[in-house]
Amino acid sequence: MTKVLAIDVGGTKLSYVIINEKGEFLSEVKKTSTAKKIEELIQTFKNIIAENEKDVDMVAFATAGAVNIENTKVDSSTPNLPKGYNDIDFSTLSQKPVFVENDANAAAWAEYKVGAAIGEDNNITITLGTGVGGGFIVDGKLLRGKSGRGGEVGSMKINGRGRVCTCNRKDCWESYASGTGLKFTAEEVAENDPIFSTSMFKTKQPKEVTTYDIVAGVKENDEYSIKVFNNWKQDLITGLINITNIFDPETIVISGGMGEFINTQEIENAVNKEIVVSPIKIKLAKAGNYSGMIGAALLACEKF
C-alpha cells in the first residue's frame, strides 16, 4: 500500500490527511488556518510534514496558483496567499518525494477517478471557494497548456460592471462567482438598491454584510438576501455557459464550499437553455471538499 500525506492549501484554511493509492483516507482530516505571513506558513508546512513523514511514502500538495509540476514550485501565486509563496521550493520541505498540483486540477482528477465523473473523458470541475478555479479533463487527460496555467477560468472576463478583482484586474469571473464575489454582490446591492433598508441586515454597513449573512438571509426569505443570491447565481451561470460552449464537456462538477448553496438541477437547466453544444450534466463533487487532496495524492502515486 502506498501512503501519501496530502495537504490542501486554501486562501483561508489548510487541511491535511494521509491517503492511499485508491483515494481512501487512512487518518482523520486535520485543519488549521492558513498563515498570513510566508515564514509562518512555511513553518506550518514543516510541522505537518515532521508530524507525519515517518508514516508516508510521499507528500502531495494541492494549492491555488499556477503550478510548475516539474520543479515543485508555484510559478504564479494567488493574491489569497502570502507574498513570497511562489518562491517556495516544496521539494525541500521533506526527505520524501514531493508532488505539487493546482488545487482545481487535483479536484478534477479526483472526480474523474473516484468521484462524480468516473469514466467521463471530457469533464470539467469548477471549484467555488474564496476564489474560482477550473480543472479540465480533455480526452482523459488533464489540460495544462504550454505553461501549466490552462484552466484558469477565474480570470475569464464576464459582465461589464467594472468590478475590481483581488488580482487588480476588472470583471474576472472569480470576482463574481466566488464566495468573495457573493460578498461583493451583497455590498453592491446594499449600496444601490433601497431593498437593503428593509432587510434583516439593515443595521449593518454594506461592507459588513458577509457571505454567511446572505446564505442565512436566503433561508429566512429575506428579500435583499434573495436578490443578492440570485444576482450571484446568474453570474455563475454566465461563466458556465461560456465554458460549456468552448469545451463541450459531458459533465461539469461543482466543488468547493460555495457548491453547498446551489441547486445543481436549476443551474443545469439554465445552462442547457443557452448553449449551442450538446446538453450537459451538472453535479456536485462526490469527493467533497477534500477532492483536491485526493486528486493530488492519486497524481503523486502515478508520478512516483
Task: Go through each PLM region and give its residues.
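Short glycine-rich, Thr/Ser-proximal phosphate-binding strand/loop in the N-terminal lobe
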Residues: K3-Q43, K73-S76, G148
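Short glycine-aspartate micro-motif
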Residues: V4-D8, M58-A60, N123-T127, T166, ...
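Glycine-rich phosphate-binding loops at beta-strand->alpha-helix junctions
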Residues: K13, I69, N80, P249-A270, ...
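A mobile "lid/hinge" subdomain adjacent to the ATP/sugar-phosphate binding pocket shared
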Residues: L14, E174-I241, F247-T251
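Glycine-rich phosphate-binding/hydrolytic loop that grips phosphoryl groups
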Residues: I19, E101, N105-K113, G259, ...
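Glycine-rich phosphate-binding loop and adjoining helix at the ATP-binding site
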Residues: S33-K46, M58-V59, G65-I124, T264-E274
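Short glycine-rich phosphate-binding loop at a beta-alpha junction
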Residues: D55-A64, F99, D248-G257, K283
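Glycine-rich phosphate-binding loop of actin/hexokinase-like ATP-binding domains
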Residues: I118-Y176
